[in-house]
Amino acid sequence: MKQSILSFIQKHQLLKEGAKIIVGVSGGSDSMALLHFLKNLQEQWEIEVIALTINHQLRGEDSTADQKFVEQWCFHSDIRCIAHQVDVGEYQRQYRVSEELAARRLRYEIYEAEMRKQGADYLALGHHGDDQVETLFMRLTRVATSNAFEGIPVKRSFASGQLIRPFLCVNKQLILNYVKENEVPFREDQTNKDNKYTRNYYRNEIIPLLTKNNERLFITAQRLSETLREDENYLAKEANRMVEEVIIWDENFSKISFSNQAFIERPHALQRRAYHLILNYLYDTLPKDLSYIHEEKFFALIERQEGNTYIDFPLSLRVENSYGKIQLYFPNRHPRHSVFHLPLQVPDQVELPDGARITSEWIDATLDKNSRNNIIIPIDSVALPLHIRTRKPGDRMTWDGLKGTKKLKDIWIDAKIPTNERDTWPIVTDDNNTIIWLVGLKKAFGSNQFCQSGEKIKLSYHKGNI
């Protein structure tokens, strides 16, 4: 098992020497095995391993006992342990979601907060190959899109680094063999036997039937997941390119239009992905009652060449076909008169529509990087002049420590910014339209750029009176 996991880590570049790793630990066999495995790599790889356990307080004394068990084992194993308690029941009542979803959201909020607080490179979770099989078959019964089989990703960008799952290459039985051979203690969660939870039903009833004649199904599932994820990444890029070439926005970014011929002449695989991209642009959050039926109606509508007809989607989104010209818009939504795009010289002072101001000046000194309303920009890292604008469809940015990019929409959601505030939120870009500063939330430049020599620009945000 050890060599299989090490080969898997190397293949997917899951770890680097000298990294700081937070391990999500529940006290069960999977997470305890992962913590033990990474602890044994600590000296060889010069990594720092931190255990993070979260008490969901769903099982009374058992939940408390799980937390104490993890803390005590970490103490005796010389592993730093961080413990949190969350109130899942209160979250359920406040947001009216299921127990499973409430627990997951709270868990990942803490994961993200601790990743940033500790400056960790990785969050390691103990999902294994059988979890992958469960996920694939659960999605098959609920999702009618090709990415249903992407399954659980081996790694993805998360908080200050990456979320990794080194155990996706092994199954539950191999993990149980590992903890037995290495005398790693663990606790049994009795709720795992309760089939009222969807995943437990698949785990206890469906998966045993599938693996009865093929114990290595988890390997096939993982290969399928990886292959389809590679294919989907390529198709997603092509769909983005298609949208850029075909779609036309009005000046207020409140209406989309395109020629049906320009759209339907593309491969069907790209058409479907472009359709979903368009909906993601128009909706801040996709409605729960949006289904494959709407997709079928959309494609039936856009193929018409004559006459005027329309269909209504959830939340009053209208899709209209007028003699081959397709338009998507919200009839009852007022145009965004607050859209702006303003040049920013240096030095300068620009007043925004809400009365706030952004000032710019040349400096040689550095700035406290924790100031939310200021940013230091090394001039050799940007294309001048700078611009201040509101959001555009598909806006993404990156920052120090983030692998890849992140949608501005997701940043606002993470920060719990109300939808009505996002349309007027000031964004600073350079002349190449690279986002430098999502004012008050994210900066593209980290502390390493602050320390660079050379001339810099200091931007400051001052709130208005209206």
Curated annotation (Swiss-Prot):
<dbReference type="InterPro" id="IPR012094">
    <property type="entry name" value="tRNA_Ile_lys_synt"/>
</dbReference>
<keyword id="KW-0819">tRNA processing</keyword>
<dbReference type="InterPro" id="IPR012796">
    <property type="entry name" value="Lysidine-tRNA-synth_C"/>
</dbReference>
<comment type="function">
    <text>Ligates lysine onto the cytidine present at position 34 of the AUA codon-specific tRNA(Ile) that contains the anticodon CAU, in an ATP-dependent manner. Cytidine is converted to lysidine, thus changing the amino acid specificity of the tRNA from methionine to isoleucine.</text>
</comment>
<keyword id="KW-0067">ATP-binding</keyword>
<dbReference type="InterPro" id="IPR011063">
    <property type="entry name" value="TilS/TtcA_N"/>
</dbReference>
<keyword id="KW-0436">Ligase</keyword>
<dbReference type="InterPro" id="IPR014729">
    <property type="entry name" value="Rossmann-like_a/b/a_fold"/>
</dbReference>
<keyword id="KW-0547">Nucleotide-binding</keyword>
<feature type="binding site">
    <location>
        <begin position="26"/>
        <end position="31"/>
    </location>
    <ligand>
        <name>ATP</name>
    </ligand>
</feature>
<dbReference type="Pfam" id="PF01171">
    <property type="entry name" value="ATP_bind_3"/>
</dbReference>
<dbReference type="GO" id="GO:0006400">
    <property type="term" value="P:tRNA modification"/>
</dbReference>
<protein>
    <recommendedName>
        <fullName>tRNA(Ile)-lysidine synthase</fullName>
        <ecNumber>6.3.4.19</ecNumber>
    </recommendedName>
</protein>
<comment type="similarity">
    <text>Belongs to the tRNA(Ile)-lysidine synthase family.</text>
</comment>
<dbReference type="GO" id="GO:0032267">
    <property type="term" value="F:tRNA(Ile)-lysidine synthase activity"/>
</dbReference>
<keyword id="KW-0963">Cytoplasm</keyword>
<dbReference type="InterPro" id="IPR012795">
    <property type="entry name" value="tRNA_Ile_lys_synt_N"/>
</dbReference>
<dbReference type="GO" id="GO:0005524">
    <property type="term" value="F:ATP binding"/>
</dbReference>
<dbReference type="Pfam" id="PF11734">
    <property type="entry name" value="TilS_C"/>
</dbReference>
<dbReference type="GO" id="GO:0005737">
    <property type="term" value="C:cytoplasm"/>
</dbReference>
